[in-house]
Each structure stands twice: as structure tokens, then as C-alpha cells.
Amino acid sequence: MKAITSNVSKSLPIGARLKCIDNTGAREVEIISVKGFKGVRRRLASAGVGDMVVISVKKGTADMRREVTTAVVVRQKKEYRRADGLRVKFEDNAAVIITEDGVLKGSEIRGPIAKEAADLWPAIGSAASIIV
């Protein structure tokens, strides 16, 4: 896995609801845990752009609802700073559902995604129409 190119603020704690922007049938998902998070006692795990999270599907088609799976955060409202000094923020928090080995479950991604997520996850970068 490639190193992330900016210092992304981890602004999505456990329990945060995100918009699902692929065509898997899920519309809204909730973060259950963050993969690879090493924290302090009693501190909620938090995720940012490019992080793999375990999610529960809250809204969507009947066969997708209540399913527990993995996803990657591709947009966040909280601004973060890139190495060149540019500050990036999006109008919503969004994720894309993937398998454990990083393969997209859907075939298309709606809306823009962050460059950091596209660099870390090549499958997401190739399926995205707009990379910011």
C-alpha cells in the first residue's frame, strides 16, 4: 500500500453515518470500527479519507440492509491539508463498499472522490469519474 500524501484529519468517529456513493444498493452506512486504529483507552476510533472501516448498512435495498461489510472513506466534511498547502473539504461524508482485499463491490462511483483515497486504493481510483 502506498503512503498517504497528506495529513488527513480523522474526523469520523465510530457511530458516524456516511453516504454510500456506489451502486451496491446501500444508501447510508454507519461506522462500526476502523481497521488498523491504535488508540488510547476509552477513546473512540476515528477515520478519515482513505481509511478502511467496518460498516453496517442502515438504509438501502432490502437485501443490503443490516449487512456488515468493509468500506473506504472517500469524502469528508472536515478540511485537511495537503503537502503543497492546499486545504481540501467536501460537502458531505461518503464511503465506497469494498471487499477485504480492496476490490469494489459495485461497478460505478457517483460524485467526486479525494485524491488520497484514489492513490491508496487503485480499484477505487480507476472506477471514479472525478478525482479532486
UniProtKB/Swiss-Prot annotation:
Task: Tell me the subunit arrangement.
Answer: Part of the 50S ribosomal subunit. Forms a cluster with proteins L3 and L24e, part of which may contact the 16S rRNA in 2 intersubunit bridges.
- Keywords on record: Ribonucleoprotein, Ribosomal protein, RNA-binding, rRNA-binding
GO: which molecular function terms? Answer: large ribosomal subunit rRNA binding; structural constituent of ribosome
Instruction: Please give the start and end residues of each transmembrane region.
Output: none
The source organism is Methanosphaera stadtmanae (strain ATCC 43021 / DSM 3091 / JCM 11832 / MCB-3)
> What is the designated name of this protein?
Large ribosomal subunit protein uL14
Family to which this protein belongs: Belongs to the universal ribosomal protein uL14 family.
Q: What does this protein do?
A: Binds to 23S rRNA. Forms part of two intersubunit bridges in the 70S ribosome.
What cellular-component terms does GO give this entry? cytosolic large ribosomal subunit
Asked whether the keyword Ribosomal protein is assigned, the reply is yes
SUPFAM superfamilies linked: Ribosomal protein L14 (SSF50193)
Annotated Pfam families: Ribosomal_L14
UniProt xrefs under InterPro entries: Ribosomal_uL14, Ribosomal_uL14_arc, Ribosomal_uL14_CS, Ribosomal_uL14_sf
Listed GO biological process terms: translation
Q: Which PROSITE patterns match?
A: RIBOSOMAL_L14
